[in-house]
Amino acid sequence: MQKRVRNRLITIIICFCSAFLGIGIILYNLENNIVFFLPPSKINAIEQDKELRVGGLVKTSSINKIAADKISFIITDNIKDLEILYQGILPALFREGQGIIAIGQLSDGKFMARQLLTKHDENYRPTR
């Protein structure tokens, strides 16, 4: 009887340890995705050359086309502004006043975006 209880206890302990280890691995892998984006006011100079997601509204009259596929614009969270440089195809919903999320790196006070995501409201409006 003593041996059965001990074996059952060892099995339960191994199951709990495995479950905690699995949860730990999942949380470690999700670490970069827990905070989807940071507003410009939360970006520090400390985060230079680190992969970031920055979100805000495209500031009015801030879009400058540098080349056919290169653009610069400013995003704001009404506290601080951040200049974004992007090379590539713009998303279809990109415009002034639109909420966007830029994925890239901060370098010399400018954000070098490698990908842009546009945000939209929850109302669906089919094209006419």
UniProtKB/Swiss-Prot annotation:
Residues 30-128 are periplasmic. Keywords: Cell inner membrane, Cell membrane, Cytochrome c-type biogenesis, Heme, Iron, Membrane, Metal-binding, Signal-anchor, Transmembrane, Transmembrane helix. It is found in: Cell inner membrane. One of its GO terms (biological process) is cytochrome complex assembly. Heme binds at H120, Y124. Residues 1-8 are cytoplasmic. Gene3D superfamilies: Nucleic acid-binding proteins (2.40.50.140). The chain crosses the membrane at residues 9-29. It is a single-pass type II membrane protein. One of its GO terms (cellular component) is plasma membrane. GO terms for molecular function: heme binding; metal ion binding. Belongs to the CcmE/CycJ family. Heme chaperone required for the biogenesis of c-type cytochromes. Transiently binds heme delivered by CcmC and transfers the heme to apo-cytochromes in a process facilitated by CcmF and CcmH. This is Cytochrome c-type biogenesis protein CcmE. It comes from Rickettsia canadensis (strain McKiel). The lineage of its organism: Bacteria, Pseudomonadati, Pseudomonadota, Alphaproteobacteria, Rickettsiales.
